[in-house]
């Protein structure tokens, strides 16, 4: 159902794993 977390938190609105196809959603990074 829900997208998986890519990282525990976002850093200044960006994901640590952003280049792996993740997006910052609220305070979590979610898989696109």
Curated annotation (Swiss-Prot):
InterPro entries tied to this protein: Cyclotide, Cyclotide_moebius_CS, Cyclotide_sf
Modification comment: This is a cyclic peptide.
Keyword line: Disulfide bond, Knottin, Plant defense
GO biological process: defense response
Coiled coil feature spans: none
UniProt domain comment: The presence of a 'disulfide through disulfide knot' structurally defines this protein as a knottin.
Family: Belongs to the cyclotide family. Moebius subfamily.
Name this polypeptide is given: Cyclotide Hyfl-C
């Amino acid at each position: 159902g829900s997208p998986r977390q890519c990282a525990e938190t976002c850093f200044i609105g960006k994901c640590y794993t952003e280049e792996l196809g993740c997006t910052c959603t609220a305070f979590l990074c979610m898989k696109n």
